Each structure stands twice: as structure tokens, then as C-alpha cells.
Amino acid sequence: MALMFPRLARNFARNGYFPTDEVTLERALQALAPAPSGRMRICDPCAGEGVALAEAAHILGRDKVQALAVEYDRERADHARGLLERVLHSDLFDTMISRQSFGLLWLNPPYGDLVADHSGASQYQGSGRRRLEKAFYQRCLPLLQYGGVMVLIVPHYVLDDELTGWLSNHFTGLRIYAAADPTFKQVVIFGIRVRRQDLARADANQVRSRLQAIGAGQEKAEEIPAAWPW
């Protein structure tokens, strides 16, 4: 499946922004399937050029989804506006978005350490290493409905004890794959949001251990597949 929408010409990594390579993006998108009925709201809170969310809307059916993108960089936000109806050019941490509003959360957050003067630092709640990826995860998780799907794209080494604990307590059906292009050491994580009391604890612990091993470099995630069994 080739991408339908044009990418920004100068779409290169800078200032914590790391675009997903096209092969990984194509394969991750192929894992999505439209809901059998009704409309779905989908969100990319770190939308970059907007291509990932535009492609997701196309796959899920433009007439069946309402898409919201948030992007900090003006040039990328302007490009996204050419692909999507609703694009906020804003710092995500300055936005007010209703909780549990979305059935799909596509999250490829900025990568790097969370410095004290970052807008998300005052809202951060955690005891482990302070990372941008974790701050954006905390900010975005409440936006996703229970039963909704998250696609999270982060470097594997961010999967420390704290983040893997959050993931295994917030999601069921977690699957992790290595990006097709290893340049940024990214992994793609799929999960379905669930209430903690509904988790199978033994399964959650097993998944957490695997995520920790991949994060520590003790185990390698398999490459994201070119075809899915559904």
C-alpha cells in the first residue's frame, strides 16, 4: 500500500521531531480496520505534517471519521491543514481537549529528555527518568476512550520500568514491533485501552516483562509485518 498523501519536502528530524519512515507508516496503517458501524473520532496530538492521520482517516473511511490534529511547528501545521479539516497549531500542553473523546490515538511524540522549562514539565507525574515521550503519553492517554486503540511510536530505549508499567496497566492486547527503518531505533506499539480492574494480571505482567527486555536491549522486537492476518 503506497501512501495517498504528499509528505513535506523538508520533513527531517530536528528539535525532538522524528518522522516515521514511509514503510513503517504504511505497515502500521494496514493494521487498522474501520468500525462496523457509526462514526469514530481519531486524533494525532503530535501530528507533524499530518500524513499519518490523513492516511488513517482514508483507511477508516472519510465519511466515518472525524479527525483532529495538533502540531506545534507552524510549517508542519500548515502542511497538515492541506490534508485535514481540523488542525490546531498549538503547544499540546496549552490545549483543552475533552477526555475520552477519541477511538483512535496515533501518538509519535517528540523524543528526548524533559527539561525543566518545557511546557509539559509542570504537569509531569512520574518518578523515573523524565522524558518527553512519557510526558506526552501522560497528557494524551486521557483523550482515548476505553476500548479505543492506541498506536504509539517511540525509541525502544524509552521503555523503562515506569513506562512499561503504565502501558501494561492501561492497555490490553499489547503488540510491539520494530520499525522497518532502524535509524531512530523506533518501535510501534499497538494496544486497546482498558480499565485496570479488567486486566488479566498474569498476562499484563508477562507483557510488561517483554517490553522491559526490549527497552533494555536484551530482546529484539520483530520487524513490523508487511501483511496482517486479519
Predicted regions and their residues:
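S-adenosyl-L-methionine
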Residues: 1-37, 52-54
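Conserved SAM-binding loop of SAM-dependent methyltransferases across substrates and taxa
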Residues: 49-62
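Conserved SAM-binding motif I beta-strand of class I
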Residues: 66-71
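Conserved SAM-binding loop
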Residues: 80-81
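Conserved Class I SAM-dependent methyltransferase catalytic core
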Residues: 128-192
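Flexible, glycine-/basic-rich loop-and-beta segments that form/coincide
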Residues: 184-230
